[in-house]
Amino acid sequence: MKIYRQIKQSFSITKIVFSFFISLLLNLVAQPTICQAFPIYAQQAYQIPREATGRIVCANCHLGKKPVEIEVPQAVLPNTVFEAVVKIPIDKGAQQIQANGQKGPLNVGAVLMLPEGFKLAPAERLSEELKAKTAGLYFQPYSADKENILVIGPIPGDKNQEIIFPILSPNPETNKNVKYLKYQLHVGGNRGRGQVSPTGEKTNNTIYNASVNGRISEITKLENGGYEITITTKNGESKIETIPAGPSLVVKKGQTIKADQPLTIDPNVGGFGQMDTEIVLQSAGRVQGLIAFFISVVLAQIFLVLKKKQFEKVQAAEMNF
């Protein structure tokens, strides 16, 4: 009986350990790594993704400049769903340097800063057409208390050069913090990996330069695919420059170089861009009043023409008399 209990206890411990490793493995597979989910950098480091100067903080890591566009309606009614279309064009066939040094397809991502009160439209408010346009896209608020700031990415760039955000406009009748006014929207969009990590270190998706003057005395290829370049100065001191896997060298052994001279090509094919636009939260009563005004103007013009014709007829009759 004692042996049976020991075997049973041993089996239970083995089962628990096995379950733990299975759970850990599933988490590693299911969750993206921090180098893949670049929006998390800004979310962790900045309370809001736009600085006082108007610069969106993504530009701190994505140093290349590329265009981005946004299209929204000129005006929207309260409590309605509309589309905000963010366009992030990429070069067809362009491939980026991945973290392991290999080339791969470009990813894209975007951050959309809406006015206070505007937010991501709930699924039950989407039309079938809008559901089809946003299928497979996962939008999330920048933080729990910033529902008006939305982020998405990384997602495949070849299939998502246009990202449609389904937005729900606020209702000033129920939200007293919102007024019928013209508001600004800010969008930032990037394609490809950054050149600087949040800690300030270079990634392998940027150019590497020499830090001193001297002569390249040795180039050693590392097991991980990178290089160690030994530069000997005039004083006989040796400076080792470490190049990660990815960037290709543009120098060779025996070459004399100067400080800040490129040691590698610039492998970055991506970049970041931002754009501002405006949208009007329009009152339905104002629209109805405007329509009524236009109708009254048209009717007044019609009556004026009829009155003029009537006057001309009377005047002609008097002249004939």
Curated annotation (Swiss-Prot):
GO terms for cellular component: cyanelle thylakoid membrane. It is a single-pass membrane protein. Keywords: Cyanelle, Electron transport, Heme, Iron, Membrane, Metal-binding, Photosynthesis, Plastid, Signal, Thylakoid, Transmembrane, Transmembrane helix, Transport. The chain crosses the membrane at residues 287-306. It is found in: Plastid, Cyanelle thylakoid membrane. PANTHER family: CYTOCHROME F, PTHR33288. HAMAP family: Cytb6_f_cytF. Belongs to the cytochrome f family. This is Cytochrome f.
